[in-house]
């Protein structure tokens, strides 16, 4: 059902086991590892440069302000542990990316990210800021998160424009944040209602029909690129 083909998994969250179960129930879904540096706690306890006085990851603002400066070796160890946890759970990752695009905060983070992608021979996404030669698609659509908040006519215009972009490019990635609202999401994220709207648009809409009925459009995962 729907046209979503790829997801990405955070290994340090309470929903990890549930996500692994869903992945195994949907073997055609591409699943990447969503490397975490800015949410909850690390998996390791020997990475002091990554955490605040409470043992939590620093938030993104700490990196923007210069308060948080990670040790590259510690970041490598933590992200490597996150990837290994996914592998140990039976996940065969299709790609690497990161929460809050943490791998693009600076070149130090990006270098660690690239080293891990090479170690595990995995594509990387969300990296055009530093290395265009490593991009995985020819077009990246960053504005889909707001589609559910548009008025009906504006939404139709946006989706028609997006469809044309898909037709014009060899490979298109539409970044989305689909989901259902529960207590944990409400407490941990300010991005809630738009997730439900995205589910509807990606499963039951004229946009879905147009994508499915176009013989020139193929739905793929990062494994296919």
Residue ranges and their predicted role:
Residues 1, 19-30, 45-56, 87-88, ...:
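Acidic (Asp/Glu)-rich catalytic clusters
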Residues 41-68, 190-192:
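Active-site gating loops and adjacent loop-to-helix segments of metal-dependent hydrolytic enzymes
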Residues 10-12, 34-40, 99-101, 129-131, ...:
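Active-site beta-loop-alpha junctions enriched in small/polar residues
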Residues 4-8, 28-34, 93-97, 123, ...:
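Structural preference for beta-strand elements that scaffold enzyme active sites
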Residues 72, 80-138, 142-156, 164-167:
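Catalytic domains of cell-wall/extracellular-matrix polysaccharide-remodeling enzymes
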Residues 9-18, 37-43, 101-108, 148-154:
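Acidic-and-aromatic substrate-binding clefts and catalytic sites of carbohydrate-active enzymes
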Residues 124-125, 188-225:
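C-terminal domain-boundary segment and adjacent tail
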Residues 121-123, 128-130, 160-161, 165-182, ...:
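Aromatic-lined glycan-binding groove of carbohydrate-active enzymes
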């Amino acid at each position: 059902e729907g046209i979503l083909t790829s997801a990405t998994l955070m290994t340090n969250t309470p929903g990890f086991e549930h996500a692994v179960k869903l992945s195994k129930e949907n073997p055609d879904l591409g699943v990447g590892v969503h490397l975490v540096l800015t949410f909850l706690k690390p998996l390791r306890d020997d990475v002091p440069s990554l955490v605040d006085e409470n043992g939590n990851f620093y938030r993104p603002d700490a990196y923007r302000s210069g308060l948080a400066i990670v040790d590259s070796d510690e970041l490598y160890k933590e992200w490597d542990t996150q990837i290994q946890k996914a592998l140990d759970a039976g996940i065969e990752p299709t790609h690497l990316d990161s929460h809050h695009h943490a791998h693009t905060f600076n070149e130090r983070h990006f270098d660690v990210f690239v080293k891990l992608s090479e170690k595990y021979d995995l594509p990387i996404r969300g990296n055009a800021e530093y290395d265009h030669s490593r991009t995985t698609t020819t077009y990246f659509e960053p504005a889909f998160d707001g589609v559910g908040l548009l008025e009906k006519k504006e939404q139709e215009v946006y989706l028609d424009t997006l469809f044309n972009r898909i037709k014009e490019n060899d490979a298109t990635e539409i970044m989305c944040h689909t989901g259902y609202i529960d207590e944990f999401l409400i407490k941990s994220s300010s991005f809630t209602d738009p997730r439900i709207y995205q589910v509807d648009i990606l499963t039951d809409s004229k946009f879905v029909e147009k994508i499915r009925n176009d013989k020139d459009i193929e739905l793929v995962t990062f494994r296919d690129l």
